[in-house]
């Protein structure tokens, strides 16, 4: 429990998407989660009640926009409205996984930009600030006119290898051209070169990679991406690296969506281990032998403390530190 008097006006609340992560964040911050209830009427309408006074408090609400994505975003919006009407002085939303982030541009005519719509809804609901981890596209920060603290899981993922002495003869692999920047940051942390899987059609999960740019033969290959959804791209990436002579292949991603038959694909894949974080709660039936889950609870807890204390959070922004 934090004894700092400045924390007397700090409140943390969690909604339904990821209570285990919220509890880890609260433990790191040193205060308990606030009391609230989320109920449903018989027709499915959501009703939220704040069960303690928050008048004049700085509030952080923890909610990933994950499956069921439409329910979780609506829960968050209703919660913000309830907090505002209860006279919270500031309402900060902690969104470990920002759902709809893949819809960040018009890929074809007459398509929406739903990542921008989510930002607009949060702003119109009068959220004060957003904290999130590894956006699918960094430019989503520009969809907001309120502060966005964009944190990175790369140091946490890199620590998995450092802590186990897996530091020699590495190569960090981007599964497509779009992820090169992410792979480069991870490579800097591990002191390793990078390679790129030449996927010419990044929206086609069934495409077999045509070639690999970079030397992977005899190396420990670490494939990194921001998310694993169906698992197809990771699976074919592991196959391509094994065929190219990689000694061992690991997979890393921040957000474990694991839709469709992703678990079966990853368990049967050439990966030695698949390392993810807990930005999304993984149900028990989606755990598998090769899965390793690391927690971003300390990262988000530290960010909340720094924001509350009005301290710079640069060291949390920079994946190289």
From Swiss-Prot:
Chief place of localization: cytoplasm
Cell wall biogenesis/degradation among keywords: no
Superkingdom of the source species: Bacteria
Residues annotated as binding Mg(2+) 1: 136
Record keyword Acetylation present: no
Catalytic activity: D-ribose 5-phosphate + ATP = 5-phospho-alpha-D-ribose 1-diphosphate + AMP + H(+)
Pathway: Metabolic intermediate biosynthesis; 5-phospho-alpha-D-ribose 1-diphosphate biosynthesis; 5-phospho-alpha-D-ribose 1-diphosphate from D-ribose 5-phosphate (route I): step 1/1
Known EC number: 2.7.6.1
Annotated binding of D-ribose 5-phosphate, by residue: 225
Gene Ontology molecular function, alphabetical: ATP binding; kinase activity; magnesium ion binding; ribose phosphate diphosphokinase activity
Subunit text: Homohexamer.
Similarity section: Belongs to the ribose-phosphate pyrophosphokinase family. Class I subfamily.
UniProt cross-references to NCBIfam families, sorted A to Z: PRK01259.1, PRK02269.1, ribP_PPkin
Name of this protein: Putative ribose-phosphate pyrophosphokinase 2
The species this protein was found in: Lactiplantibacillus plantarum (strain ATCC BAA-793 / NCIMB 8826 / WCFS1)
């Amino acid at each position: 429990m934090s004894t700092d008097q400045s924390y007397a006006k700090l409140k943390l609340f969690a909604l339904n998407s990821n209570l285990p992560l919220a509890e880890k964040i609260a433990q790191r911050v040193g205060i308990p989660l606030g009391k609230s209830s989320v109920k449903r009427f018989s027709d499915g309408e959501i009703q939220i009640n704040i069960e303690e006074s928050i008048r004049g408090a700085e509030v952080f609400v923890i909610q990933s926009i994950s499956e069921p994505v439409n329910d979780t975003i609506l829960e968050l919006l209703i919660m913000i409205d309830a907090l505002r009407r209860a006279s919270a002085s500031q309402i900060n939303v902690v969104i470990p996984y920002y759902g709809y982030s893949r819809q960040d541009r018009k890929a074809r005519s007459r398509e929406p930009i739903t990542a921008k719509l989510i930002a607009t809804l949060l702003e119109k609901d009068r959220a004060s600030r957003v904290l999130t981890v590894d956006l699918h596209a960094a430019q989503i920060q520009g969809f907001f006119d309120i502060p966005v603290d964009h944190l990175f899981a790369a140091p946490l993922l890199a620590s998995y290898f450092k802590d186990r002495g897996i530091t020699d003869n590495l190569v960090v692999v981007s599964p497509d051209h779009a992820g090169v920047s992410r792979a480069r940051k991870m490579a800097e942390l591990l002191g390793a070169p990078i390679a790129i899987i030449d996927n010419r059609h990044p929206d086609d999960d069934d495409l077999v990679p045509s070639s690999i740019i970079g030397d992977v033969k005899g190396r420990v290959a670490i494939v990194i991406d921001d998310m694993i959804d169906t698992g197809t791209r990771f699976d074919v990436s592991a196959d391509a690296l094994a065929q190219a002579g990689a000694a061992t292949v690991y997979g890393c991603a921040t957000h474990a969506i694991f839709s469709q038959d992703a678990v079966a694909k990853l368990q049967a894949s050439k990966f030695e281990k698949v390392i993810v974080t807990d930005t999304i709660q993984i149900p028990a039936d989606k755990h598998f032998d090769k899965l390793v889950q690391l927690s971003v609870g300390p990262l988000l807890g530290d960010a909340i403390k720094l924001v509350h204390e009005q301290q710079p959070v640069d060291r949390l922004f920079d994946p190289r530190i």
